[in-house]
């Protein structure tokens, strides 16, 4: 009964529970496999993959903030060829029943399509998370990220959906005037779901050098500080679309995960909490039945349907 009440069914994903380590906070799984059995997880969102290898931004690339952190990693990854030849086969060999969500990044719709097509052929990749918080090299769009321009977002998502053999979930940036417009563009382009939110943009300064702490100047802010923002934006989007949402942004406890459900999420991504506590995900999973009992929640699916009805 405990297992059934935690199960989640989404396009392409039948999960034993809703807890998913967020992309960029869990590597390709090997880093955390020494701490616990990854089969405990609902799924894994692996690190972003681009067509070619990327070495990322210069250091320092990480800085602490009150109730969170800043990062400017720069999409460091070994590239599609290595991910297909080494990273995904390791996961399939060690965890053959664990569904993988592949995070895909790029700088043109052609690159998004190529990576989506290639990575979706891996048998353990059951869905793609499309990271559209990247600059675009095809258009002179004055420094806008792809996810800040609904028309660009539509083109990129459509290209990825047409190229992919698995459902595509689109990761939305909160750095927009109207996130609903971008969400609707993704839906119109054929997305099967959404993940949100990506990091906010912030910076810190070193009083001694009088310069930004991050070599890149700015970085993505994550952690508990962004949690209320994530809840608000998830609720805003959930009121306007029937696409399932994998909610993320500052989740560090079982209670926070259930709050995401109340906002309109259908599954939960856990990011920065993995850095402060490598057991964050299994801890949340273990506590779910107890906390659900405390608040009279019989199953996550019933809670999801209850929230969905209230949003209409």
UniProtKB/Swiss-Prot annotation:
Catalytic reaction equation(s): (S)-dihydroorotate + NAD(+) = orotate + NADH + H(+)
Instruction: Tell me the GO BP annotations in alphabetical order.
Output: 'de novo' pyrimidine nucleobase biosynthetic process; 'de novo' UMP biosynthetic process
Source species: Streptococcus pneumoniae (strain ATCC BAA-255 / R6)
The protein's predominant localisation is cytoplasm
State whether it acts alone or in a complex, and with which partners, per the record.
Answer: Heterotetramer of 2 PyrK and 2 PyrD type B subunits.
Pfam families in UniProt: DHO_dh
State one molecular function term (GO): dihydroorotate dehydrogenase activity
Q: Know the name of this protein?
A: Dihydroorotate dehydrogenase B (NAD(+)), catalytic subunit
List the keywords (alphabetical): Cytoplasm, Flavoprotein, FMN, NAD, Oxidoreductase, Pyrimidine biosynthesis
Question: What detail does the entry give on cofactor binding?
Answer: Binds 1 FMN per subunit.
Q: Where does FMN bind?
A: 23, 47-48, 103, 131, 171, 197, 223, 249-250, 271-272
CDD domains to which the protein is assigned, alphabetical: DHOD_1B_like
Principal EC category:
oxidoreductase
Output the superkingdom of the source species.
Bacteria
Q: Where in the cell is it found?
A: Cytoplasm
Q: What is its EC number?
A: 1.3.1.14
- What does the UniProt function comment say about this protein? Catalyzes the conversion of dihydroorotate to orotate with NAD(+) as electron acceptor.
The residues annotated as the active site are 134
Q: Which GO terms describe its cellular component?
A: cytoplasm
Q: Which residues bind substrate?
A: 47, 71-75, 131, 198-199
What family does this chain come from, according to its entry?
Answer: Belongs to the dihydroorotate dehydrogenase family. Type 1 subfamily.
Q: Which cofactor does it need?
A: FMN
**InterPro entries, per this entry?**
Aldolase_TIM, DHO_dehydrogenase, DHOD_1B, Dihydroorotate_DH_1, Dihydroorotate_DH_1_2, Dihydroorotate_DH_cat, Dihydroorotate_DH_CS, Dihydroorotate_DH_I
Its gene name is: pyrDB
